Amino acid sequence: MNSINKKEIEKFSKIAEEWWDPNGKFKPLHNFNPIRIRYIKENIIKDFKIRSSDKPLKNIKLLDIGCGGGLLSEPMCRLGASVVGIDASKKNIEVAKFHAKKNKLKIDYKVASPEMLKDKKKFDVILNMEIVEHVNDIDFFIKESSKLLKKNGIMFIATLNKTLKSYVFAIVGAEYILKWLPIGTHDWEKFVKPSELIDISKKNNLSLKKLDGMNFNILDNSWKVTNDTSVNYITKFIKN
């Protein structure tokens, strides 16, 4: 059994060259990235009681699952974390490696999914950001991800809620009307309700500590953390 959805991998491999183009196919992710980075950084600092510095994450071992071209791996590395980035798309990893080398960043990138990591070393923090809606089997994926997390470690999972509003905004609006994303980027049937995600995680020794919405304000072109989880949401789990 594995968590890889070949159709999804092919879809993202086709546009892999555009990962680092802020005006390309991944423009929405570039706009979304600053709030994700801030949320992750602030929560890690708080939970691990880190005294902030230039490199606040310097003692943190972090695994970025479904890292794509490295949009989150690189900022985490710059913040001092020891980063491993994995993705099932060889093309994505090639792009990520090239960009990290160009920027003299030491990131360990591998073509893999969680169940494929052979050394099974444990991490302080795992990022599953905008990935669970693209995997083959979410239960298996969370189970395998959880195995890689240290006791009391943090797992961040960000995804899309399965609501009428998410269908209207994330698919009809973002893909068909505003053309922010290529048509077919998302499949509403694979969106996950927070209650489902919490249940699956609970079965895998993960306790929910935080659940927040992330909403886009079209008027000022910015993302904000809110209580509204009806479209995009982010969770923080702690390993029991």
Curated annotation (Swiss-Prot):
Pathway assignment reads: Cofactor biosynthesis; ubiquinone biosynthesis
User: What EC number(s) is this enzyme filed under?
Assistant: 2.1.1.222, 2.1.1.64
GO MF annotation, one:
2-polyprenyl-6-hydroxyphenol methylase activity
Instruction: Identify the InterPro entries for this entry.
Output: Methyltransf_11, SAM-dependent_MTases_sf, UbiG_MeTrfase
Tell me which UniProt keywords the record has, alphabetically.
Methyltransferase, S-adenosyl-L-methionine, Transferase, Ubiquinone biosynthesis
Instruction: Report residues binding S-adenosyl-L-methionine.
Output: R36, G66, D87, M129
| Transmembrane region(s) | none
What's the protein called, per UniProt? Answer: Ubiquinone biosynthesis O-methyltransferase
Listed under catalytic activity are:
a 3-demethylubiquinol + S-adenosyl-L-methionine = a ubiquinol + S-adenosyl-L-homocysteine + H(+); a 3-(all-trans-polyprenyl)benzene-1,2-diol + S-adenosyl-L-methionine = a 2-methoxy-6-(all-trans-polyprenyl)phenol + S-adenosyl-L-homocysteine + H(+)
Query: One Pfam family name from the record?
Result: Methyltransf_11
Sum up the protein's function in the record's words. O-methyltransferase that catalyzes the 2 O-methylation steps in the ubiquinone biosynthetic pathway.
Similarity remark: Belongs to the methyltransferase superfamily. UbiG/COQ3 family.
Q: Can you supply a Gene Ontology BP term from the record?
A: methylation
